[in-house]
Amino acid sequence: QKPKAVINAIKDYYENDHSNVHRGVHTLSVRATEAYENAREKVSQFVNSPNKNQIIFTKGTTESINLIAGSLTNLIEKNDEILITAMEHHSNIVPWQELCKRTGAILKIIPINDNGEILIDKYTEMVTNKTKLVSVVHLSNTLGTINPIEEIIDSAKLNNAITVIDGAQSAGHLLVDVQELDCDFYLF
């Protein structure tokens, strides 16, 4: 279900301002574009992004992950390593499997313990100069685990790996500060 405020905003848009964004100079297009850019500004503030132009709208987290994985084909090479956790949702597994298939990279799984927590010591051992990307869920809706993404990002950055954080379940429940996290991508 959707909050009433969301339903009302969508209804108002379709009744009063439905037009292509950034595609016209007529009144409806201008209003739709202003609303779109205002939303970008609000999201930027919500996650403390240093620049609203770093906010990219997609249909959802799955599409965002697919977009990133599809964009990295020329940066990932044979025997490079991509790390994900054993708790990932299918949408944060399959795109990386497909990227590995296209490039010859190796997908490695970060183990978790019986409580559903990342074995952080094993993770830090797994991150090497071959690691090109680390993609992990911030908060697992199946296990209830809140991952130590600050530590995960820091270890990845020490090896110049790209960091992708799946925030689909966390952004609505936890304070997210992308400047403090210093991740490359935070998706929700």
List the predicted regions and their residue ranges.
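Pyridoxal 5′-phosphate
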Residues: 1-188
